[in-house]
Amino acid sequence: MSGPTLLKESGPREVFCGLTSIVWLHRRMPDAFFLVVGSRTCAHLIQSAAGVMIFAEPRFGTAILNERDLAGLADAQEELDRVAKELLQRRPEIRTLFLVGSCPSEVIKLDLSRAAERLTDELQGRVRVVNYSGSGIETTFTQGEDGALAALIPFLPSSDERQLLLVGTLADAVEDRLVHLFNKLNINAIKSLPPRQSTDLPAVGPGTTVLLTQPYLTTTARLLKDRGARVLTAPFPLGAEGSRRWMETAARDFEVDEAQIDSVLSPLMERAQIALAPHREVLKGKRIFLLPESQLELPLARFLQRECGMELVEVGTPYLNRDQMAEEIALLPEGTPVMEGQHVELQLDRVRDSKPDLVVCGMGLANPLEAEGIATKWSIELVFSPIHGIDQAGELAELFSRPLRRHQLLAH
């Protein structure tokens, strides 16, 4: 069978933990609060990643587990109840409280699901309390969002209404633009998960067609199928081609006429080609190595190879759901090494041996590689940037052309 070469490896990994997803989730749902049950290290990570000043009133915090908790000398459940109740008393605007597990809370087997049920009962429905794990022991950082959305699914109302459900966090402006385009295709019943208010949960049922906006929502997709929804398989909306195919998949499911699809999307594709042109000049023929971290690697590789002319040395991904990623896999060049999992030392050896022009990697690896003269791109920046949709193709390409330009300037 032709197509990329699918490989696997395991060993030491270099990734952020799932707590990082709180940074974009708390911006999406301003009436929700994310209470991490973890260590001071967890608190420092979230504070630094979010860039919030210490005097601000952010919508996240950390219930610190100290030495007595970790040694089992204190009742951590009792202390957690006290912290949560004090928080809700001080912040009456909170409507959903997420209790977020961490590596320390999982090591001591702290049962956050029991705490969430107990607090929900005591608060008598005034605040919904849910829990999920943001631990990095077995997961990568984007899976924090998958856990948070999966925790909300039992609370979604049931409905047989014919509707399109966009699943995965997008920047508000990007989502508004995509909804506007779907409206022009006569798809008007559109809901989002996560919603912009945590209490405005979408209904789901046999009439629901799910279109994933992010490739890392495997558990969420499975649970939505269990609720009767149908999950479409499509390339993800990164780059002009992927975004068009993504929208076409939904439009055909809603039986939109091909001529109407073309009339709405073709002008956008023409503009995208103009926006891509200056970046393609920089990227064409350059060799790129994508280390596994965000699970965006396959859609990005497809975009960079097919629309920007880059050569793929290796495409790493933390996990590969072959069913969900089937359309992306089919669009990659024959023989491209796609490596699921990570042995970071072996991958770094392959980076040094292959001498790529650009490496997409985590922040912890970027500086050492830059010191060796290899241009890098932080993978986490791709998660925080508004890169989805045909309109954003030029901005997405610029995220890769910029480090190459900078590297060339420094070299001269």
Swiss-Prot record:
Cofactor-binding details, from the entry: Binds 1 [4Fe-4S] cluster per heterodimer. The cluster is bound at the heterodimer interface by residues from both subunits.
Assembly with partners or alone: Protochlorophyllide reductase is composed of three subunits; ChlL, ChlN and ChlB. Forms a heterotetramer of two ChlB and two ChlN subunits.
Protein's UniProt name: Light-independent protochlorophyllide reductase subunit N
Sections of the chain in a coiled coil: none
Purpose of the protein: Component of the dark-operative protochlorophyllide reductase (DPOR) that uses Mg-ATP and reduced ferredoxin to reduce ring D of protochlorophyllide (Pchlide) to form chlorophyllide a (Chlide). This reaction is light-independent. The NB-protein (ChlN-ChlB) is the catalytic component of the complex.
Organism: Synechococcus sp. (strain CC9902)
Gene Ontology MF terms: 4 iron, 4 sulfur cluster binding; ATP binding; metal ion binding; oxidoreductase activity, acting on iron-sulfur proteins as donors; oxidoreductase activity, acting on the CH-CH group of donors, iron-sulfur protein as acceptor
Catalysed transformations (reactions): chlorophyllide a + oxidized 2[4Fe-4S]-[ferredoxin] + 2 ADP + 2 phosphate = protochlorophyllide a + reduced 2[4Fe-4S]-[ferredoxin] + 2 ATP + 2 H2O
